[in-house]
Amino acid sequence: MLSFLWDLASFIVALGVLITVHEFGHFWVARRCGVRVERFSIGFGKALWRRTDKLGTEYVIALIPLGGYVKMLDERAEPVVPELRHHAFNNKSVGQRAAIIAAGPVANFIFAIFAYWLVFIIGVPGVRPVVGEIAANSIAAEAQIAPGTELKAVDGIETPDWDAVRLQLVDKIGDESTTITVAPFGSDQRRDVKLDLRHWAFEPDKEDPVSSLGIRPRGPQIEPVLENVQPNSAASKAGLQAGDRIVKVDGQPLTQWVTFVMLVRDNPGKSLALEIERQGSPLSLTLIPESKPGNGKAIGFVGIEPKVIPLPDEYKVVRQYGPFNAIVEATDKTWQLMKLTVSMLGKLITGDVKLNNLSGPISIAKGAGMTAELGVVYYLPFLALISVNLGIINLFPLPVLDGGHLLFLAIEKIKGGPVSERVQDFCYRIGSILLVLLMGLALFNDFSRL
């Protein structure tokens, strides 16, 4: 319950910030163009708070925080007294109206740059993209990428950490190949390797793009040595103690902790013959994992924690810049996100990315809660990502969105007169139906992931 409330609160904060930024873009440019703004509302429904300024603009925070709007004086909506007609939105030039409409998405992009600017000043912790293991018969194995290799760039774009690698790989969905620049860790002897992506079975909502290529990142080492044994657990009942090293399971040598975890998970209630080493002496024990529910079937659980050797400092990286360099890096990062968002939306249309990858408010709320819990340097990039997506989607030439309004203005500029009210009304209805269908699909995907 606490987790749900945290996710909800983080989601409401994120939504409130991004909607305010978007609507403020419309509001600010409208004021600069001499348009009278009658209401600036964050949310819909019953007003929880309201205030009116000296220019007559009413500011509102409403009950339902799922959107917002800026209401401008407009003769098409209501009669306007003659002395105020020059302040009406519909009486402004096509260029001014286009600027007002485009200002919302532009504000979202500027906010993303600002968020990344703050993050790069604070410092972004990351891990150098050094390969730990390569899965047999994988795409990475076929390209002869070896453990200990550092991934320096993807198609010429530098990748200082694993997050940068993932961002570039996601953009390669549907491509036939990509070129990765690699070098032995600690060396500048670079070479290019080509990955064949024609049979790359990667689904963004189900797996990590790096692991889908058969690459396991170099991370903290987990040894088959027990750090802690929970009281009254299956491990405690079997006689296991902190400091024990598990040597064999059912006669098979154990070299990786993950192998032991899988054996325990797959054998609830079944006996596992262990050979361990305790203070240099061999010892044989029988372990019977307890059963607990998980993903529709029973899984084994024994109540132990392994010894973890932290990642050495030379594998860690912190991206931190001064105020001016941070602006350059933040702008570049935002531009990369904008290109990725457009690319992914295009691939959704062409079918290279499946529609079940669409995410709705539940997935966004989970992301908000998770990143907020990790800290500000993770929450701000999340806000930047959603802000960029909000800006790009609003520019789609779909009636009811900013892009649809811009399309009507472009037609008006070309033909020398506005699109008829009848045509606009019909297009708004079609656009609303399409938007509701997309939102329904996104919600369906969200619930199917629960």
UniProtKB/Swiss-Prot annotation:
Name of this chain's protein: Regulator of sigma-E protease RseP
Effect of residue 26 to F: Does not complement deletion mutant
SMART domains: PDZ (SM00228)
Function: A site-2 regulated intramembrane protease (S2P) that cleaves the peptide bond between 'Ala-108' and 'Cys-109' in the transmembrane region of RseA. Part of a regulated intramembrane proteolysis (RIP) cascade. Acts on DegS-cleaved RseA to release the cytoplasmic domain of RseA, residue 'Val-148' of RseA may be required for this. This provides the cell with sigma-E (RpoE) activity through the proteolysis of RseA.
Spans within the Periplasmic topological domain: 22-103, 397-429
Main location class: membrane
Self-association state and partner proteins as the record states: Interacts with RseA; the third transmembrane domain can be cross-linked to the transmembrane domain of RseA.
Active-site residues per Swiss-Prot or TrEMBL entry: 23
GO terms classed as biological process: cellular response to cell envelope stress; positive regulation of DNA-templated transcription; proteolysis
Class in the EC hierarchy, top level: hydrolase
Membrane-crossing residue ranges in chain numbering: 1-21, 104-124, 376-396, 430-450
Mode of membrane association: Multi-pass membrane protein
Coiled-coil intervals, chain numbering: none
Cytoplasmic topological segments: 125-375
